[in-house]
């Protein structure tokens, strides 16, 4: 299960802000 402010996606958890970021910006947070 993901924390309440994260979203499950393809077996991973993402914070909502990643939805409006492009892939390169999102990868910098990994």
Swiss-Prot record:
Expressed by the venom gland. It is found in: Secreted. Residues 1-30 form the C-type lectin domain. SUPFAM superfamilies: C-type lectin-like. It comes from the Eukaryota. Keywords: Blood coagulation cascade inhibiting toxin, Calcium, Disulfide bond, Hemostasis impairing toxin, Metal-binding, Secreted, Toxin. One of its GO terms (cellular component) is extracellular region. GO terms for molecular function: metal ion binding; toxin activity. Disulfide bonds join 2-13. Belongs to the snaclec family. Heterodimer of subunits A and B; disulfide-linked. Calcium is required for ligand binding. Anticoagulant protein which binds to the gamma-carboxyglutamic acid-domain regions of factors IX (F9) and factor X (F10) in the presence of calcium with a 1 to 1 stoichiometry. This is Snaclec coagulation factor IX/factor X-binding protein subunit A. It comes from Bothrops jararaca.
